Every structure is written in structure tokens, then in C-alpha cells.
């Protein structure tokens, strides 16, 4: 026999577990798209020496990443996985030997997703803009240096 309070406790526990998983899934999705957009910007800098497009892509990706990342409590493991997903997708796009229609569609889809995420999290981003800009400038400079050295 399940008492009413046990049932409610189990329901609450299951809801908590599922909601935490959905937070992680959304963060993973945004991390993946941030990597795709950063990879696109990096390829623009490498192939076309278009620093403005690189800067814009990087800024959009970082703001969406931190906007989503700061919106819920995250474990160190969640953050580590999200950063790995981001880095993997930067490499995936940056190292593309040729752009197929599928790659192009993925890049466009990710720009849209990140644009919407920045709009959705705009207040959170504004409230944390100093911290976000520190990371933005630090990592943008590092990636530019790596691209220009290669």
C-alpha cells in the first residue's frame, strides 16, 4: 500500500530528476550550437580573414552559452560535459574539408537557436555582463591566437 504522502514524495522526486535532466539536455543543446557557431566564426577568420564575423559569432555563442549555463544550478560534471561538447563542435565545423548542405543547415539552425536563447536570457545576460565579457575577451583572444598561428 502506498500512502498519499509516499506517492506525492515519489512524484516530487521523479519530477525533480526529470527536470534536472531537461536542464542538462537544454544546456547540452546550447553548448553544441555554441561550438558550431564558434567553429563557423573561426573558419571565417582562417579562410577569409574576416575578424568581424569571428567576433560576432564568438560573442553570440558565449552569451547564449552563459545565458543558459547561469539560468540553473549546474554540477561541475554538467559544466565539464558542456565545455567538451562545445569544443568538439568547434573542431567539427572548423575542420570541415568542404561544406555540404547538411553542414550549412546545421550552422544556420544553430545561429537561430542561439539568437533566440540570447533573447530569452537577455536579463540574465545583462545582469552578468561583466563576468561574461571577461570570459568572452579571454577565450576570444586565445582562439584568435591559435587560428593565426596555424
Q: Language-model features: where?
A:
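Terminal low-complexity, poorly structured segments
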Residues: 7-9, 14, 56, 66, ...
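Short N-proximal segments of mature Sec-exported proteins
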Residues: 25-80
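Compact alpha-helical subdomains of small soluble proteins
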Residues: 61-150
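Compositionally biased amphipathic helical and low-complexity segments enriched in hydrophobic
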Residues: 8, 12, 19, 46-49, ...
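Intrinsic disorder/low-complexity segments enriched in polar/small residues
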Residues: 5-7, 21-22, 52, 77, ...
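Classical Sec-dependent N-terminal signal peptides that target proteins to the secretory pathway
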Residues: 1-25
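Structural motif
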Residues: 22-30, 98-102
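Hydrophobic alpha-helical segments
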Residues: 6, 12, 30-31, 38, ...
